[in-house]
């Protein structure tokens, strides 16, 4: 079965990098987010791997980059969708937030006509997230805070606890969802998500 995402068709056994274009700068230059898709020849679940929701959390970005560089994202069955940097503005400026001062992880699921951060959340939630059967989101300790490597999951979820044990981080932390976060949006639509935290931002 072909996967049609962001207007592009990807067949089983194919790989493709698609540009997720959601806004223009004042110079009319498009702002594009690379979306790396790998499909096995055998059908199976789709795993969405993201990082860089906060632009200064570069450890997560590098983890996803290494997953791609080492071909860990090539599945035996099913599909992987990798987005190393969701907040390109923040990443380029080494800033947690968007240029409008908003935190992308506090505006989900976003609105079509809202702030820049809200529009990114909206189009990501509408155009990419529905394809995911499982989500894995990589973060780094914010505001120069060091976080021990850990997986954060929603409390009282046997499925997430099982997935966390498979990931096998040194710590599994049961944390309630924060309003308007990516994790909360996944929870509301019934898509399991593991959130990884590790290290310190800007390092």
Describe each PLM feature range.
Residues 1-203:
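Structured catalytic-domain cores with a bias toward divalent-metal coordination
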